[in-house]
Swiss-Prot record:
Function: Converts seryl-tRNA(Sec) to selenocysteinyl-tRNA(Sec) required for selenoprotein biosynthesis.
Biological source species: Yersinia enterocolitica serotype O:8 / biotype 1B (strain NCTC 13174 / 8081)
Name of the protein: L-seryl-tRNA(Sec) selenium transferase
Group of enzyme by EC: transferase
Reactions accelerated catalytically: L-seryl-tRNA(Sec) + selenophosphate + H(+) = L-selenocysteinyl-tRNA(Sec) + phosphate
Coiled-coil ranges (or none): none
Length: 462
């Protein structure tokens, strides 16, 4: 089609007339007039620019409703499901722990309507939003009380603010951790109005170091679990029971930030040991903080357990309202914790435990099936193989421990890194993107977290 540009401009339909067209009715019902109007204005601008450059109408101008629907279908949700084949089970950038079906159902129910978030059915009056979940946590850990906030960083910040603002906090030099996003314990203390007092050395700290640091300005003795790194060799550290006894001797509270935190003995499932909150409560620690979405396998949340006198102060502080968890978080956390009342079924019901304990042989068999299905489609450009590899737990949990796994690897036949880059870019653009990892000149798809082979193969079908 050819015509003068000014003539073509006049052929562009008005937005009002487009919105009144019968073909637009389904789109109006689905998306609303405001969104359609915004997109039609953009399309008009693009059509004018096309006329200016090429002196013709763009092909899509022949059917504006179809072009608009195509455009709207390309809109991406803010959070998009992906296949996590990275080899990191609790991948922070991919949302950490997948929720159990019971937790998903609980969140769905909580979203549908009114719930007893802060309402007491027994007294027909105001209740406390943490109460039901706190009671369950106390049952599972032996703590006197519990407090729930929106993540563990918030839990640590609230704890420091309440227990030690304007005072000194004594911490071993070897426990001044930094986690992802440049979250550093010294920085958090500074923001909470605390003064950090470092004791010991990077690799060795003794009880006498804490004792010598205590003064009339001391507000808290604190331990931080080094969940995302390990110091090995010539080392020494102080057990929580010893530190708690020292704190009681001087009437100074003690606290431990576990970071990850597991409510079950991981060695029971053939996994490396991880400190459990209930062990620290039994050791006499006044407050313990840990995450809900790491080894616990629940939603993002910060959990604080311990002595009721301190939990009461946390609950009454204005900062608690700023950091409190919403009804969806509490519903998911409650449902997740209830699974721990059936420890013999955890690997069946809790996805995090199921993925962490998945037998290597099962993963290897899955890898062989995936290889057989994909080899014909990719053999021209890549050499595909099944190779053993090591998965990691992730999210700063058990940093030096690895889980034996198996992967399908893609090695470019021309040895080109650009071929791998093109493949990963293409897979990230799929309806359900595939996230692997590139190492040693090939792309690795670690299948530990793959539970729907058929869905993966549908995405990768030519």
């Amino acid at each position: 089609m050819s015509a003068e540009p000014h003539h073509l401009y006049s052929q562009l339909p008005a937005i009002d007339s487009l919105l009144r067209a019968p073909e637009m009715a389904p789109l109006l019902d689905e998306y609303g007039a405001a969104l359609l109007t915004e997109n039609l204005r953009l399309m008009q601008a693009e059509a004018r620019e096309y006329i200016r450059q090429f002196h013709t109408l763009a092909d899509w101008c022949a059917d504006w409703p179809a072009a608009l629907r195509h455009r709207l279908n390309q809109r991406q949700p803010a959070l998009k499901p992906v296949f996590n084949l990275s080899g990191t089970v609790l991948h922070t950038n991919l949302g950490r722990a997948p929720l159990a079906e019971s937790a998903i159902a609980a969140v769905t129910d909580a979203m549908r309507g009114a719930v007893t978030l802060e309402y007491s059915l027994s007294g027909a009056g105001r209740g406390h939003r943490d109460r039901a979940v706190a009671d369950l946590l106390c049952e599972l850990t032996g703590a006197e009380d519990a407090c729930i906030v929106n993540n563990n960083a918030a839990a640590v910040f609230l704890m420091l603010t309440v227990m030690a603002a304007g005072k000194q906090v004594v911490v071993s030099r070897g426990e001044l951790v930094e986690i992802g996003g440049a979250f550093r314990i010294p920085d958090v203390m500074r923001q909470a109005g605390c003064e950090l007092v470092e004791v010991g050395t990077t690799n060795r700290t003794h009880l006498k170091d804490y004792r010598q640091a205590i003064s009339e300005h001391t507000g808290l003795l604190m331990k931080v679990h080094t969940s995302n790194y390990s110091i090995e060799g010539f080392t020494a550290s102080v057990a929580e029971q010893q530190l708690a006894a020292l704190g009681h001797e001087f009437a100074i509270p003690t606290a431990t930030d576990l970071g990850s935190g597991s409510l079950v003995d991981m060695t029971r499932y053939g996994l490396p040991a991880e400190p459990m909150p209930q062990q620290l409560i039994a050791a006499g620690v006044d407050l313990v903080t840990f995450s809900g979405d790491k080894l616990l396998g629940g939603p993002q949340a910060g959990i604080i357990l311990g002595k009721k006198q301190w939990i009461d102060q946390l609950q009454q502080h204005p900062l608690k309202r700023v950091l409190r968890a919403d009804k969806m978080t509490l519903a998911a956390l409650d449902a997740t914790l209830r699974l721990y009342q059936q420890p013999d079924r955890l690997t069946e019901l809790l996805p995090t435990m199921r993925l962490l304990t998945r037998p290597a042989q099962d993963i290897a068999e899955s890898a062989q099936r995936v290889l057989a299905a994909l080899n014909g489609s990719y053999a021209a450009d890549f050499t595909l193989a099944v190779e053993s590899c090591w998965s990691q737990i992730g999210s700063g949990s058990l940093p030096v421990d690895r889980l034996p796994s198996w992967a399908v690897t893609f090695t470019p036949k021309d040895g080109s890194g650009s071929a791998l880059e093109a493949l990963t870019v293409r897979w990230r653009g799929l309806a359900k993107p595939i996230i692997g990892r590139v190492a040693d000149g090939r792309l690795w798809l670690d299948l530990r977290c793959l539970e729907d082979e058929a869905a993966l193969l549908r995405e990768l079908a030519p």
